[in-house]
Amino acid sequence: PPLTIRPQEGIVISLVSDLYLEQGFYFKAEGAQSTFTKDLATPLSPNVKSLKPFIEAHTSTITDFAAQAAVGKKGKNLDLGVMVKYLGAGFQTIGYPFLQSDRLDYLLNTRINAWKNKMNIVASLGQRVNNVKNTALRAKQFIGNLNWFTQFSDKFSLNINYNNFGFQTASGLNPFGIKNVSNDLGINPTFTFTGKKIIHLISMSYNYSKYDERDVMTGLTTSNNTHTGLLTYVPTYLEKEISPDFSILYFYNNVPGAKITLATFSAALSMQAAKKKMRLRGQLQYTLGKLNSFSSNNNLIASCNIDFKLTKKLTWATFLTTNYFKYGNEIIPNGANYVETGCRTGFQYRFDTKKQK
């Protein structure tokens, strides 16, 4: 095996206790101890406590503990609770090799159901303390998430979500502390209009993502900012065997040294034919892309799916596609382009595992 890979072993023993009281009150607690050997090739050590007969301690064996406790109250329309989690500096498990140890998390969790069950909010808010045992390198990080759904009427609903997650340590000097933190915000309104012959569904979504990363050698923090907007329109005909859909996608990504912009327009139509034995779907997609100050790229894709039902369990599936891409002036020669055409066909057989009577 590669010299960088070492034989390892570990064991975790945990004790879980849950207590539920009247009127929705609860208390949950868990304690765990890990004994982990980073390299089985190291010599045995009598100075480290073994966990026989499971593990015999080596010089690379470490033992530590972790604990988690939660207390709160659950109700029909309101949940409120507090959770505290601690992972010791030497706590490590085989199943999660990248688990961030030596940290303390405390969270306030809540769920709110209001407005005659038309509004639902699930949120958590708290703080993470890293390097708990090392005061000089101790760092604090905000953690939280939110999911807020509201059904304003039969025609309009709105969903808002926010997530913050990542890894952060205090910034020292050469090497500097690690920082990989992401903040994501999403807004998704949906409109539905119902007529006698058609149902109109309009869905819009906007997502903003900010990812900060610190270089451990230079100490510089770079940000990756992404904006994504999507507009989708799906009409459903109640008296026709056709299903069209239309969408517009906007994507913007800004990182040091590169700004990428994409705009995609898509239209598709699916229908049944040959007494519903054949299903057809065609799609046309055009993408306009731009990198920094170079001229725009152009991409046109046309595709078609043909599924023909030969028997109850056997289907003949065919896929056709043509892809035309024209580059901007970021490469030489300017205006370079290519056309790619593909055809894929095959048979699909569905096996029925139900027993015949």
Task: Cite the ranges covered by each PLM segment.
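Exposed, low-structure sequence patches enriched in small/polar residues
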Residues: 3-357
